[in-house]
């Protein structure tokens, strides 16, 4: 506080205090108009504006908002419009809805989440509660970027952000942003297995694959290798040495865990390095993920691996 001529702090001085904005408030301000409220049978969820083509706007939200038909969408400006459901994905709990607008809307800028580091600050944003007019915002750090988690009913392993920030029901389907206001994930509504004290969001990289499938086909088909993998390029020299991997190796994905298989076919093993699938080079887990979205459960894929220092090919039946 500043003092007046008498040496005492004045009420006027206190009322004139200037509060500065932070990286968090700047990111929220930048992204606010790209988050919407999705209203379904008196319940409120969130959605993100993923794309705009002329007057057609595509919004991703939670399947909870679409289970009883087409929900209403309320933009941050307060404009309410009806929507059409394009498709939904029961595995991830993500749905795609479409609205028509005659006003300007702003889709999110999407970050390549392979660049997101452990310990990065993130903000989870909801649409506005239509009763109170307020929006829920919570902040935290990414405990694990790109962690693989299985939901409670299938063997599909989703690429997730594990975060230490609390999440409420209205934030389901909402945005996870970095401090530049870019989308890094969408809040998951499925019961993914993991640390019960953590919350999860589907990475923006996988969200793009889900969106493209829903937009094109109205549904998502995918196969699963049934393994948890890690980019070889992310492994430190001592980790490579411990696993017998050439320290100069920069591409491929390392098999960390094998999920119980239910189909016949050759098995991947812990310690395998996947270098190619169907003749396509696998430089990172994102390549593996994208390849799985081109297949369905029951398909057989040809997988090139390095096992025990030797190269070999195996046929894997996808789950």
Q: What positions do the PLM features span?
A:
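C-terminal recognition in membrane/secretory proteostasis and scaffolding
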Residues: 1-4, 84-86, 98-99, 180, ...
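N-terminal, intrinsically disordered, polar/charged segments of Gram-positive cell-envelope systems
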Residues: 1-37, 44, 69-70, 150
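A conserved glycine-rich beta-strand in the N-terminal activation segment of trypsin-fold
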Residues: 21-25, 35-59, 80-82, 107, ...
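Terminal peptide-recognition signature
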Residues: 33-38, 47, 57, 61, ...
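Active-site loop architecture of trypsin-fold serine endopeptidases
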Residues: 44, 70-71, 105, 126-139, ...
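Catalytic-histidine neighborhood of serine endopeptidases
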Residues: 52-95, 99-104
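Short, well-ordered loop/turn sites that connect or cap secondary structure elements
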Residues: 65-67, 110, 116-117, 177, ...
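Short glycine/Trp-rich loop-beta-loop segment that forms part of the substrate-binding cleft
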Residues: 111-134
